[in-house]
Amino acid sequence: MSILKEAYLYFANGLFFKAQSFGSDGTFVGEVVFNTSMSGYQEVITDPSYSGQFIVFSMPEIGIVGVNNQDSESPRAACTGVILSSYNDFVSNFRSEQSLSTYLKEHNIMGICGVDTRNLIKMLTTQGAMMMIASTQITQESELKASLSRTPPIQDINFIKEVSTKTSYVHTDSTFDFTHFAYGTSPNFKAKVVAIDFGAKRNILNELVAVGLEVEVIPHSFSAAEILSRFKAGEIQGVFLSNGPGDPLVLHNEIEQIKQLIQSDIPIFGICLGHQLLSIAHGFPTYKLKFGHHGSNHPIKNLQSGAVEITAQNHNYCVPESIAQIATITHRNLFDNTIEGVRYKDKPIFSVQHHPEASPGPREARILFEEFAKLCCK
């Protein structure tokens, strides 16, 4: 059983209260957002897009299925901390390898419980996502306030260097086979693509492999000239721009390289941050949502088929309506009508804001990976 310690929380709006800590000790600062997923907390916590953030889970009890060695979206926990109503340290799942508390401590992630998360989420929907500080060491409100005031705004921080791969590698895993409880492989590749890693989720790369694409993952500090040279030589047939954390507007070097890519005829598919970077590279800067979209139960409408799809989402930024000048809007969010997908006119480029890889969300949006594979095989 985890020994709970006292934790003190201070928010940018002045809210201060005491809770309990079941994760790593220390003082942690980050932006607080909320996630409405009913399951899949391990995938959420290990999603690199949550770098620099505290995640408030709307699900009232978390922890009973523990943590296993297969479901992580990246090699380590990515968020700053998690905030729960109730943490259950009694693990009851045949795949579990360790408790959530043990996992968080190993990865230096704060775990906070004993919080009225319903009220906290209502505050965030009213006032918006904000910065907060939490500590098991500092107990005084004035000290926490002073420490938080010295923290730079999250929109000024570049998290990509921390979560991107340092060296190129070939990703070989395909989607998870529940009959054998193992990741499969794809022996028949139709084309080869480079996946630019801004904090790519494992299951997104798995989906690319599953549709017959050989996937070479490369660092965020890529060279557009090198990619285009390989494309012209027939070595690769497409580019994938991954998801990732933070404000896309701070990624100046990456945007400049993408500007070169979009001047060519190389097929490009972007998800989440990749979707936003394509918009900026085309001259349409993103804007920040009040409290973002975080969860595996967000409905969107496919404007091409008329179908409603339930999607997994994790983003605080959105592309502007003016993108319609150069792209066809393909998907819209049914919660707030924001843009969820675009297809650029007269170019083999398309992108979506949501996460179509369906882990832990549903499978309806997987056709997007098949569309990308078809573009690369032309």
Curated annotation (Swiss-Prot):
<comment type="pathway">
    <text>Pyrimidine metabolism; UMP biosynthesis via de novo pathway; (S)-dihydroorotate from bicarbonate: step 1/3.</text>
</comment>
<dbReference type="GO" id="GO:0004359">
    <property type="term" value="F:glutaminase activity"/>
</dbReference>
<keyword id="KW-0547">Nucleotide-binding</keyword>
<feature type="active site">
    <location>
        <position position="355"/>
    </location>
</feature>
<dbReference type="Pfam" id="PF00988">
    <property type="entry name" value="CPSase_sm_chain"/>
</dbReference>
<feature type="binding site">
    <location>
        <position position="317"/>
    </location>
    <ligand>
        <name>L-glutamine</name>
    </ligand>
</feature>
<keyword id="KW-0665">Pyrimidine biosynthesis</keyword>
<dbReference type="GO" id="GO:0006541">
    <property type="term" value="P:glutamine metabolic process"/>
</dbReference>
<keyword id="KW-0055">Arginine biosynthesis</keyword>
<feature type="binding site">
    <location>
        <position position="246"/>
    </location>
    <ligand>
        <name>L-glutamine</name>
    </ligand>
</feature>
<keyword id="KW-0436">Ligase</keyword>
<feature type="binding site">
    <location>
        <position position="49"/>
    </location>
    <ligand>
        <name>L-glutamine</name>
    </ligand>
</feature>
<dbReference type="GO" id="GO:0006207">
    <property type="term" value="P:'de novo' pyrimidine nucleobase biosynthetic process"/>
</dbReference>
<comment type="pathway">
    <text>Amino-acid biosynthesis; L-arginine biosynthesis; carbamoyl phosphate from bicarbonate: step 1/1.</text>
</comment>
<dbReference type="InterPro" id="IPR017926">
    <property type="entry name" value="GATASE"/>
</dbReference>
<dbReference type="Pfam" id="PF00117">
    <property type="entry name" value="GATase"/>
</dbReference>
<keyword id="KW-0028">Amino-acid biosynthesis</keyword>
<keyword id="KW-0315">Glutamine amidotransferase</keyword>
<dbReference type="GO" id="GO:0006526">
    <property type="term" value="P:L-arginine biosynthetic process"/>
</dbReference>
<comment type="function">
    <text>Small subunit of the glutamine-dependent carbamoyl phosphate synthetase (CPSase). CPSase catalyzes the formation of carbamoyl phosphate from the ammonia moiety of glutamine, carbonate, and phosphate donated by ATP, constituting the first step of 2 biosynthetic pathways, one leading to arginine and/or urea and the other to pyrimidine nucleotides. The small subunit (glutamine amidotransferase) binds and cleaves glutamine to supply the large subunit with the substrate ammonia.</text>
</comment>
<keyword id="KW-0067">ATP-binding</keyword>
<feature type="active site">
    <location>
        <position position="357"/>
    </location>
</feature>
<dbReference type="GO" id="GO:0044205">
    <property type="term" value="P:'de novo' UMP biosynthetic process"/>
</dbReference>
<protein>
    <recommendedName>
        <fullName>Carbamoyl phosphate synthase small chain</fullName>
        <ecNumber>6.3.5.5</ecNumber>
    </recommendedName>
</protein>
<dbReference type="GO" id="GO:0004088">
    <property type="term" value="F:carbamoyl-phosphate synthase (glutamine-hydrolyzing) activity"/>
</dbReference>
<comment type="subunit">
    <text>Composed of two chains; the small (or glutamine) chain promotes the hydrolysis of glutamine to ammonia, which is used by the large (or ammonia) chain to synthesize carbamoyl phosphate. Tetramer of heterodimers (alpha,beta)4.</text>
</comment>
<feature type="binding site">
    <location>
        <position position="273"/>
    </location>
    <ligand>
        <name>L-glutamine</name>
    </ligand>
</feature>
<dbReference type="GO" id="GO:0005524">
    <property type="term" value="F:ATP binding"/>
</dbReference>
<dbReference type="InterPro" id="IPR050472">
    <property type="entry name" value="Anth_synth/Amidotransfase"/>
</dbReference>
<dbReference type="InterPro" id="IPR036480">
    <property type="entry name" value="CarbP_synth_ssu_N_sf"/>
</dbReference>
<feature type="domain" description="Glutamine amidotransferase type-1">
    <location>
        <begin position="192"/>
        <end position="378"/>
    </location>
</feature>
<dbReference type="InterPro" id="IPR002474">
    <property type="entry name" value="CarbamoylP_synth_ssu_N"/>
</dbReference>
<feature type="active site" description="Nucleophile">
    <location>
        <position position="272"/>
    </location>
</feature>
<feature type="binding site">
    <location>
        <position position="276"/>
    </location>
    <ligand>
        <name>L-glutamine</name>
    </ligand>
</feature>
<feature type="region of interest" description="CPSase">
    <location>
        <begin position="1"/>
        <end position="188"/>
    </location>
</feature>
<dbReference type="InterPro" id="IPR029062">
    <property type="entry name" value="Class_I_gatase-like"/>
</dbReference>
<comment type="similarity">
    <text>Belongs to the CarA family.</text>
</comment>
<dbReference type="InterPro" id="IPR035686">
    <property type="entry name" value="CPSase_GATase1"/>
</dbReference>
<dbReference type="InterPro" id="IPR006274">
    <property type="entry name" value="CarbamoylP_synth_ssu"/>
</dbReference>
<feature type="binding site">
    <location>
        <position position="244"/>
    </location>
    <ligand>
        <name>L-glutamine</name>
    </ligand>
</feature>
<feature type="binding site">
    <location>
        <position position="314"/>
    </location>
    <ligand>
        <name>L-glutamine</name>
    </ligand>
</feature>
